[in-house]
Regions:
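ABC nucleotide-binding domain signature
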Residues: 184, 598, 757, 795-813, ...
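A short helix-turn-beta junction within AAA+ P-loop NTPase domains corresponding to the substrate/partner-engaging
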Residues: 867-884
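Conserved catalytic loops of ABC-family nucleotide-binding domains
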Residues: 287, 833-867
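Conserved ABC transporter NBD signature motif
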Residues: 778-789, 797
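Structured non-transmembrane domains adjacent to transmembrane bundles in polytopic membrane proteins
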Residues: 49-70, 79-164, 386-576, 608
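Conserved beta-strand
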Residues: 734-751, 781
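Membrane-embedded transmembrane helical bundles of large multi-pass transporters/channels
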Residues: 1-39, 103, 122, 133-389, ...
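Glycine-rich P-loop/Walker A and Walker A-like loops and their local beta1-loop-alpha1 context
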Residues: 742, 753-776
């Protein structure tokens, strides 16, 4: 892959204006399209097949008024006055609401069939509205006529009266950004300028990240017309896209600047930077992408959609870094080259810097380091035992939001339970006295602990479904309300035995419990998926057993610490002022699984960027301790800069973030800080020091079955080092190439125009042909075939080298005639050529290739090749022999 990325980087550098124009055109096209055709966000939280959701769906069919989209107007009279004094104005407003086309029904506070719409003090009243927007979430423009009626009512009431709109229709808090989030980008710019040593260079990662986020957001806004997208999704994607977009560009750009400092040509440097660091970026992005798509394990639609769009944002960030960034490098050209160091500075002996000092401390005292870090992180994890989760509600919005104002007024004048009423539905089709039955159920429910009131208990018009509205004593995110839901569910068997009716409990809190239970159930399989993926990926990358185990344990410590810190601040209220939190509150239900997914990808990024350099030092002959220290000093500054940037981006989404995103941003900021600085840059060197040589041990059987990932562009580095090898004009040059158990070490050289025979047992002969054409993995030596280096560029060899085994074709003549030959052609089992047509087809093929390529004819023995004029015959060595040339 690194060779392909190298070519992509150079192409984008050369075609810079075209690439830049394409990306900016795509951004403009999607932006305009989104502005013209975007839909609205939907904050409906649903779980198909859950009992509460099925009850709600059934209610929509049998009692549509009870399940319709709702809104309410809260009217609060001035201190010392009663709303009854302004009944005429309120009733007129009810009529005005009723006249609006989207209002199915407007219920007056003095409706004789509904209780609880006037507060006990008489100072506040509620106007209930049932709305119909065709099943779609309403936009602010669609709600404007309703809001206008409320404003007119407030103007008609005595001075000091408050009229606020709230309820389900107004609970959608639209995503917004403020100047505070921009501070994170300013900090990122400062860090980039320090690391890269240039303000111009520092601006490139910001430009690419913002472009990528803009494209992803425009696409998301456009698709709101097709998909139900939660309002948390865009801010999550913006936050994540900016963080990874800047980091990915930093890794590539820092490599480019280092290479320019060493005197490399800018175009060549761009290609190498994309081929080497770009390989790590692809791996890093892929891990985050897979983890985000893994959120679908929970089988909760809104969470799956959130994961998909966040994953798309990360994918766009990766592609932008691999294409748009090298194009911008090409635009700046030599201006990206750092100023050369003075001769005096170059000769001055370097003093150990802070990174050398820090890794020295951790590796000199590994046991103390491990005990201290683990103890601190376990202690920080303990508050997670009290972690409270809930779905978003208006009470978690900013104080200036209309829905939040209405929420607070309802809590103050009617009690907190009015903001989260429960609905009990009853199947009363077999009842002969539906009104009496509903009255009995109402009396039973009013006697349950935690019930404040039952304002409504009525059958529908067909008398087959009953609806009971239950107002708890506590708010929707209070654990006591969840206890009440369970108490109502426990009474279902009693009501079936007593009244012969089946009942269900639904409403926001009931759905919340179902979602929380389903998310809790999904945590284990998702955790197994993440941990399993971590072990396999890192074992494949580092060819080690202990490195992935250590990395996974570190990831779990980071996740636990992030959970604990989030519970401490948001649930317990410790230092809540720091995050601009008014009061302790639950965090959004899907935060745990979301944090696990995102932090997994980010943790693997830092592990790969840091430990791969240590492994490189070890492979090149340094002792384990020297490799740890050298790798840390070399990669630590970039990893630290990347972590600081990511923390800054996340942290500045906290102060002004909407309720759900505030907790998510805080948890991610803490998680990244813990993982980067305590786990990867402190715990990892200490653990690797204790492991010593064992850190890089991998059983041979596991080494054979694991895939190989070239995350640091080692293949490209090898190809660059051997770009002139063998340098003799050959089209095929093999040096001790071998396949364990199949082909012994072989040496072979072909120049353009050569036609040779290769003989030997089927295994050795065919194995050699497959290995030389990139179709069989080699275990020793190397070769260059048609310009492709083996074993590194086996894919390129397969594209450039043709292989045909006549033992597997029905008509050799037709197969040979239809063949599109590559630079080198291997024809196996030529002894099967018997017809004149097949001989003619082979001669024609040889003539087509002979000009600038070579042909190898393979057979069991040399006698089968006598019909062809050959430049020589080569005996393919089997693995059991050392013979290399006939």
């Amino acid at each position: 892959m690194s060779a392909w990325l190298y070519a992509v980087g150079r192409w984008c550098y050369r075609r810079r204006l075209t690439v830049i124009a394409l990306w900016l055109s795509l951004l403009a096209l999607l932006g305009v399209s989104a502005g013209l055709w975007m839909g609205s966000f939907n904050n409906a939280f649903e779980i198909p097949s859950s009992r509460s959701q099925e009850a709600l769906d059934k209610l929509r069919m049998t009692f549509p008024q009870g399940a319709a989209l709702s809104a309410l107007a809260v009217v609060v009279a001035p201190e010392g006055q009663q709303v009854a004094e302004s009944r005429e104005q309120i009733e007129a407003a009810v009529a005005d609401f009723d006249d609006l086309p989207m209002v199915e029904a407007a219920t007056s506070p003095w409706n004789e069939y509904v209780d609880g719409l006037i507060s006990d003090s008489g100072r506040a009243a509620i106007i209930q509205l049932s709305l119909d927007f065709g099943g779609e979430a309403p936009t602010e423009e669609q709600l404007a006529p309703i809001t206008d009626v409320a404003d007119d009512l407030e103007a008609a009431m005595p001075a000091g009266t408050q009229v606020s709109m709230g309820g389900e229709a107004y609970n959608i808090e639209l995503p917004h950004l403020s100047i505070i989030e921009g501070i994170g980008l300013i900090i990122a710019l400062v860090v980039l300028a320090v690391v890269l040593g240039s303000l111009i260079a520092a601006g490139l990662p910001l430009l690419t990240a913002v472009t990528g986020v803009g494209i992803a957001m425009a696409l998301m806004l456009l698709l709101t017309r097709i998909f139900d997208i939660n309002s948390t999704t865009p801010l999550l994607s913006v936050m994540l896209g900016l963080a990874v977009g800047i980091d990915y560009a930093l890794f590539i750009l820092s490599r480019h600047r280092d290479q320019l400092r060493d005197g490399l040509d800018p175009e060549e440097s761009a290609g190498r930077a994309v081929g080497t660091s770009g390989s790590a970026v692809v791996f890093a992005g892929l891990t985050v992408f897979i983890a985000l798509l893994g959120l679908g394990v929970a089988n909760i639609p809104f969470l799956t959609v959130m994961g998909i769009f966040a994953a798309v944002t990360v994918a766009v960030a990766v592609v932008i870094a691999l294409t748009f960034l090298p194009a911008l490098m090409g635009l700046l050209g030599e201006r990206m080259r750092p100023k050369p160091r003075s001769a005096a500075a170059a000769k001055r002996p370097g003093r150990p810097g802070p990174f050398a000092w820090w890794v020295g401390v951790t590796t000199r005292h590994p046991v103390a380091t491990i005990v201290t870090v683990v103890a601190a992180l376990v202690a920080l994890t303990l508050p997670v035992l009290g972690l409270q989760v809930s779905l978003p509600n208006a009470g978690q919005q900013r104080p200036d939001q209309p829905a939040r104002i209405a929420y607070d007024l309802l809590s103050e004048h009617f009690g907190p339970g009015v903001n989260g009423p429960l609905i009990v539905t009853a199947d009363i089709i077999g009842s002969t006295d539906p009104l009496g039955l509903m009255a009995s159920l109402k009396d039973d429910i009013e006697g349950i602990d935690g019930v404040a009131q039952v304002p409504l208990a009525t059958p529908n018009q067909n008398a087959d479904t009953g609806l009971i509205q239950v107002v708890p004593e506590t708010g929707p995110d209070d654990p006591a309300t969840a206890d009440l839901v369970r108490a109502l569910m426990e009474r279902q068997d009693h009501w079936l035995a007593e009244y012969g009716v089946e009942t269900d409990v639904t409403g926001l809190t009931a759905v919340q419990i179902d979602i929380s239970e389903k998310l809790t159930a999904a945590l284990l399989p998702f955790g197994v998926l993440v941990v399993g993926l971590s072990l396999v990926l890192l074992a494949a990358v580092f060819r080690s057993v202990w490195v992935p185990i250590k990395a996974t344990v570190g990831y779990l410590l980071s996740v636990g610490a992030a959970f604990g810190a989030t519970a401490l601040v948001f649930n317990y209220g410790v230092a809540k002022e720091v995050v601009n939190l008014e009061r302790p509150m639950p965090v959004i239900s899907f935060l745990p699984i979301l944090l696990m997914g995102i932090l997994f990808g980010l943790a693997m990024d830092y592990e790969v960027f840091l430990v791969s350099r240590m492994r490189e030092e070890y492979v090149h002959g340094k002792s384990p301790l020297e490799a740890i220290r050298g790798g840390f000093v070399a990669s630590g500054p970039v990893v630290m800069a990347a972590a600081i940037i990511m923390i800054a981006v996340f942290a500045f989404f906290v102060p002004e973030g909407m309720g759900a995103i505030k907790a998510i941003a805080f948890a991610l900021a803490v998680g990244v800080a813990v993982d980067a600085f305590l786990v990867r840059m402190t715990l990892v060197p200490a653990v690797l020091t204790l492991l010593g040589e064992k850190a890089w041990w991998l059983p041979a059987w596991l080494d054979r079955i694991l895939p190989t990932f070239d995350v640091e562009g080692e293949v490209l580095s090898t190809e660059m080092a051997l770009k002139d090898w063998p340098g003799d004009g050959s089209v095929l040059f093999a040096d001790q190439l071998a396949v364990a158990g199949v082909v012994g070490p072989l040496d072979l050289r072909l120049v353009p125009g050569n036609v040779i025979g290769m003989v030997g047992p089927t295994g050795a002969r065919t194995g050699a042909a497959l290995a030389l054409s990139g179709r069989l993995e080699t275990t020793g030596g190397r070769a260059r075939v048609a310009g492709a280096l083996l074993p590194e560029a086996a894919g390129a060899a397969r594209r450039r080298v043709s292989y045909l085994d006549l033992a597997h074709v029905d008509d050799p003549a037709q197969a040979l005639s239809a063949m599109r030959p590559g630079k080198v052609v291997f024809i196996d089992s030529v002894d099967l050529i018997t017809s004149p047509e097949a001989h003619a087809a082979l001669d024609s093929l040889i003539d087509r290739v002979r000009g600038d390529g070579a042909v190898v004819l393979c057979a069991a023995v040399e006698d089968h090749l006598t019909d062809h004029q050959l430049d020589g015959v080569f005996a393919a060595p089997s693995a059991a022999h050392e013979e290399t040339r006939a």
